[in-house]
Amino acid sequence: MPELFAYTDGACSGNPGPGGWGVLLQAKEGDRLVKERALKGGEAHTTNNRMELLAAINALESLSRASTITVVTDSNYVKNGITGWIHGWKRNGWKNAAKKPVANAELWQRLDEANARHDVTWKWVKGHAGHAENERADELARAGMAPFKP
């Protein structure tokens, strides 16, 4: 059975401003690439954090059945949010530690639902540090943003 990986990235020109998200999905058997699929999208007026979240959401929502997958992101916001902070937010009625509404709560809720359907391992990598798949995800995010740039 191949191992599944999703390499995700978001990009924004200005913050807020036009933005894009990209996903590189790969199925691997050992070091051998079995299948690959690229996803991208964007919005005219958004933030980098929203694009990072949408990349992860679209990666998981694109899977047609419950899967074991490793999601690789360069966003500490996404990784820390889904593996840690979200538990407190849910307990506190989607309020943060300062008792304020959680930013991007609707996207966090979507990610939480998508995450629950799969067996997900979340992994952080440093962005723009020569990680080939992360660089590809970044290129996809920039391509997703392109139609929305003036």
From Swiss-Prot:
Sequence ranges assigned to domain RNase H type-1 in this UniProt record: 1-146
Pfam families (UniProt xref): RNase_H
UniProt entry keywords in alphabetical sequence: Cytoplasm, Endonuclease, Hydrolase, Magnesium, Metal-binding, Nuclease
GO CC, alphabetical: cytoplasm
GO MF terms, alphabetically ordered: magnesium ion binding; nucleic acid binding; RNA-DNA hybrid ribonuclease activity
GO biological process, one term: DNA replication, removal of RNA primer
Cofactor(s) the protein needs: Mg(2+)
Matching PROSITE patterns: RNASE_H_1 (PS50879)
Subcellular location: Cytoplasm
Catalytic activity: Endonucleolytic cleavage to 5'-phosphomonoester
Sequence positions that bind Mg(2+) 1: D9, E52, D74
E.C. no: 3.1.26.4
Binding-site residues, Mg(2+) 2: D9, D138
Taxonomy, superkingdom: Bacteria
Enzyme class: hydrolase
Cofactor binding mode and count: Binds 1 Mg(2+) ion per subunit. May bind a second metal ion at a regulatory site, or after substrate binding.
Family: Belongs to the RNase H family.
NCBIfam families: PRK00203.1
Summary of the function given for this chain in its UniProt record: Endonuclease that specifically degrades the RNA of RNA-DNA hybrids.
Subunit structure, as described in the record: Monomer.
Protein name: Ribonuclease H
Biological classification of the source: Bacteria, Pseudomonadati, Pseudomonadota, Alphaproteobacteria, Rhodobacterales
